[in-house]
Amino acid sequence: MRIAVMGAGGVGGFFGAKLAQGGHDVAFVARGTHLAAMRERGLTVKSALGDIHLPKPAVTNDPAKLGPVDVVLFAVKLWDTESAAEAVRPLVAKGGVIIPFQNGVESIQRIGAVAGAEHVMGGVAYIAATIGEPGVIVHTGTMARLRFGPVLSLQQPIAEALLAACKGAGIEAELTADIRRALWEKFVFLSAFSGLTSVARQPIGVIRADPDLRTTLEAAMREASAVGRAQGVGLADDFVAQQMKFGDSLPAVMRSSMQNDLAAGNRLEAPWLCGAVARMASEAGVPAPVNATLYAVLKPYCAGAVR
């Protein structure tokens, strides 16, 4: 397959490198020092699942130079969604699809408004990975899985082709017929995890070990679950309990990407995570005081470090 990776950070860099290693035609879109390092030294992935080094990856800062592709793995930060979608729109004009592997539950609609609904599928990435230094992706733990699925029936063939490509490249992947539910299943945990680790400035190990923080994490997830159910998402009755067990299984040192962004003085995805829970809860008439408070505390930092 011909694949473009829009955003060669932790998620895009890891899975793009795996697909390239598997023999697929993969081009990365990156910028700044990461772009320069990839051009000079290649792309390196450090992972307990096996290190990867692509000595001469196809990389550019201009998607217009890539030409038509079958799939765009769309992994930019949420604040760049519309501008990045506009940049890759020409790449899928001849029948390709954009699959957002982002946080949040609104990317399909946001990208579809720019590129056309027929060109957007849904995707969920389960991985903890980040740019350790320019040109180097560091994967924490061993979780590295993709779930994706069509939104329209005409997208089924390309979804199946990508599934085969992933499995051939050694990527744990699953095709789902209910991508909306899959997105919400991740969102419920992630919105609470990212919000609370950022506000507390502590990794998941500290959060789950402290009784007060653990209770707050569970309460934030219960609020998000209630919002999802109010929107017709079929979450299991014991879903939050399952997610608490999932949280207990994660490496104690794991931090959310939003916590890392906060520490670095970068912009935050809070408006589309805990902020989105609070906003959608208000629209649905569902109480969400924990998420509203998490968002209120993080709001001053959403545009970057407070000077």
Residue locations for each model-derived region?
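NAD(P)+-binding Rossmann beta1-loop-alpha1 motif at the extreme N-terminus of oxidoreductases
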Residues: 1-54
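Generic preference for hydrophobic
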Residues: 28, 58-60, 148
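Internal alpha-helical scaffold of NAD(P)-dependent oxidoreductase catalytic cores
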Residues: 37, 90-91, 113-119, 123, ...
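NAD(P)-dependent Rossmann-like dehydrogenase/reductase catalytic/cofactor-binding core
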Residues: 218-307
